[in-house]
Amino acid sequence: LCGQSVIPALFPFLVLCSLLVSLGFGELAAPSLAGLMTPLFRLPGCASSALLLGLAGGYPIGAQTAAELYREGLLTQGEAERLLAFCNNSNPVFLISVLGAGVFGSVRVGVWLWLIHILSALLTGLAFRREGKCGPRQYPKREIPCQNLSLFTALVQAVRGGLAGMLSVCAFVVFFYVLASPLAALGGRLGPVLVGLTELFSLTPLISPDGFGFVLAAGCTGWGGLSVLCQTAAVLEGSGLRLRSCFWGKALQGALSSVLALILRGWVLG
């Protein structure tokens, strides 16, 4: 499972997010994207890197990037924790190829699952914006690693950090994959729901290609599962960031995704 699916999909993004933040991508992106992130989410522009990488790379890339931004002093603790509520998202390849094409036999359905996922994440971010304030930001002056180290050395450091994070992610995926197996035996609709609340990879073969399956797929990918929460806790370890906002953010995103899928299922499935 990890060798065929998890590691190829996540490891490059774990390395990339660490490399981009250490090379100063957050500072470079902040001025141009502050006009979007600040009015919508009351977050500085550098937070966009966590949101974009989270949407592209899948769980737990968004959380990893948010933690890196906080460690580098680019976000306050409150900003980083609000960002965690909506920046940690599912991989589009999983939504479009595995669920859409593989389960529903339609890339179009997968694209709609992806769009629902993005919209619910953004709506979750809007819901959490009321808790924060964000004015003009003076970013801390720091030496960018590429000024003192070669790009090769910076890459080696990012790969080492990514490997440590990848081991934790794989450990939780395997643990919850095994834990979810007995739940699948419950059958009916209860079994898939409980499996989906626990671990996403185990849910895939249990999803029926109908309206219920569409709502279940959207809701569970929005929630992420207990496995994703533990993966997130692992990448946040030592950062000082709390998991609470991530938990409530994923719960809200899962609920919003389910409602949107329920509204759209007749039109999407035709």
Specify the residue positions occupied by each region the protein language model found.
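Juxtamembrane boundary at the C-terminal end of a transmembrane helix
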Residues: L260-G270
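Intrinsically disordered, low-complexity non-transmembrane regions of multi-pass membrane transporters
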Residues: G132-R160
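Alpha-helical transmembrane segments
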Residues: V6-L10, V109-G125
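Transmembrane helical segments that form the transport core of multi-pass membrane transport proteins
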Residues: L23, L155, V159-G225
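Membrane helical hairpin/interfacial module
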Residues: Q4-A9, F13-T65
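Interfacial loop-to-transmembrane junctions
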Residues: V235-A255
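Alpha-helical transmembrane segments of multipass membrane proteins
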Residues: S120-T124, F128, F176, A180, ...
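Alpha-helical membrane segments and immediately flanking helix-loop junctions
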Residues: L40-F104, L194-S208, F212-S239
